[in-house]
């Protein structure tokens, strides 16, 4: 019997990327964009096997003739039919397993609408016939992956940023904070500030190009004002980027102006505090006795924490806010892009976790709301 035969499937459905694989593995087998592409034009060549919709990497590669849609926005599923297609693609094309033979661990952002996880549960049991499933909170899994039981996790992906303090394995729900400001908003902002340079990006396919520019060239400035002055005085921050058609664009202070928006959301016209202040606010909502441990274990996770310079900037900002004697440590593991998935893989393979699964039998007896009773 191979190890994959009975192992759990771990699926981290992000707003931007879907990470999937087997519990117990140290990395996801499949990582692909959580997108559905539909042709914008009429197919004229018969026998080419054109589909009415493409999923993931295939949609990405044919994006020039497709309209791309992401079924998950700000961590909440907005189109369940498309979501089901993504799950189908995950199980049958990427992992090549039968979902009715494996327990399935899914992930979710905290403070999501309750109906979201009920519907997830319903689809898993009714459409995919899974024998058992569980829904875990993303930030909690990141803490598992970092090997800690106490810490505050700042998880920022493509759709949602959330901050979850955990003490000795207990999440502190009153102090969980959520910002609907993440990678996708930064991509849109970069699209906007690139138009100031005379580069026009408008279609859903061009947005993907801008996302690539963002991932390859953006960084977080340690001191934003100083960096702006430096950029105005010299051309050192300038970098060039070759578009798919060979045209070369130049990008300068946009490289750090774009991610600055997660520290200063007012750039996007969003009235909220930046990630540093939100993290501080979350710590201040916790009991005075445990704050010290949270300051010393601030864990970053998610794709939007991959900008060079973000950990140093975070450290600097929190030192400014916190009491002067406090020891502050920002933990930014190199694999933090996948730490939610890795935490899920660890959780699914723990022997003590096996009684936590929601079984098909329990679902049949209680229906979708069972998920609120059994999952944190």
Swiss-Prot record:
- Alphabetical list of InterPro entries matching this protein: Actin, Actin/actin-like_CS, Actin_CS, ATPase_NBD
According to its UniProt entry, one GO biological process term is: cell motility
Q: Which domain of life is it from?
A: Eukaryota
Disulphide bridges: none
Q: Which PANTHER family match?
A: ACTIN
Further remark: In vertebrates 3 main groups of actin isoforms, alpha, beta and gamma have been identified. The alpha actins are found in muscle tissues and are a major constituent of the contractile apparatus. The beta and gamma actins coexist in most cell types as components of the cytoskeleton and as mediators of internal cell motility.
User: What protein name does the entry list?
Assistant: Beta-actin-like protein 2
Q: Which organism is it from?
A: Homo sapiens (Human)
């Amino acid at each position: 019997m191979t190890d994959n035969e009975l192992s759990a499937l771990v699926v981290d459905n992000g707003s931007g990327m879907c990470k999937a694989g087997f519990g117990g593995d140290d990395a996801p087998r499949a990582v692909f964009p959580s997108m559905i592409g539909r042709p914008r034009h009429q197919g004229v060549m018969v026998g080419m096997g054109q589909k009415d919709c493409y999923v993931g990497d295939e949609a990405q590669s044919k994006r020039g003739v497709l309209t791309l849609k992401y079924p998950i926005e700000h961590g909440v599923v907005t189109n369940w039919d498309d979501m089901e297609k993504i799950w189908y693609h995950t199980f049958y094309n990427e992992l090549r397993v039968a979902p009715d033979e494996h327990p399935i661990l899914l992930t979710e952002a905290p403070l999501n609408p309750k109906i979201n996880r009920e519907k997830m549960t319903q689809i898993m049991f009714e459409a995919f016939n899974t024998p058992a499933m569980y829904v875990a909170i993303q930030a909690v899994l990141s803490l598992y992956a970092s090997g800690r039981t106490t810490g505050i996790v700042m998880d920022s992906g493509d759709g949602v940023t959330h901050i979850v303090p955990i003490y000795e394995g207990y999440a502190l729900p009153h102090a969980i904070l959520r910002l609907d400001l993440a990678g996708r908003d930064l991509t849109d902002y970069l699209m906007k500030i690139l138009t100031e340079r005379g580069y026009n990006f408008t279609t859903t396919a061009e947005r993907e190009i801008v996302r690539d520019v963002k991932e390859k060239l953006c960084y977080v400035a340690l001191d934003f004002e100083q960096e702006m002055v430096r950029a105005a005085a010299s051309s050192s921050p300038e970098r060039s980027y070759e578009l798919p058609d060979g045209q070369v664009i130049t990008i300068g202070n946009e490289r750090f102006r774009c991610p600055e928006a997660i520290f200063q959301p007012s750039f996007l016209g969003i009235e909220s505090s930046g990630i540093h202040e939100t993290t501080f606010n979350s710590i201040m909502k916790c009991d005075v006795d445990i704050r010290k441990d949270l300051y010393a274990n601030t864990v970053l996770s998610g794709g939007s924490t991959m900008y060079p310079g973000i950990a140093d900037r975070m450290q600097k900002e929190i030192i400014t806010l916190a009491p002067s004697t406090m020891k502050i440590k920002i933990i930014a593991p190199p694999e933090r892009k996948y730490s939610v998935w890795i935490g899920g893989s660890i959780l699914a393979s723990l022997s003590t976790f096996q009684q936590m699964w929601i079984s098909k039998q329990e679902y049949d007896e209680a229906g979708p709301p069972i998920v609120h009773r059994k999952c944190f």
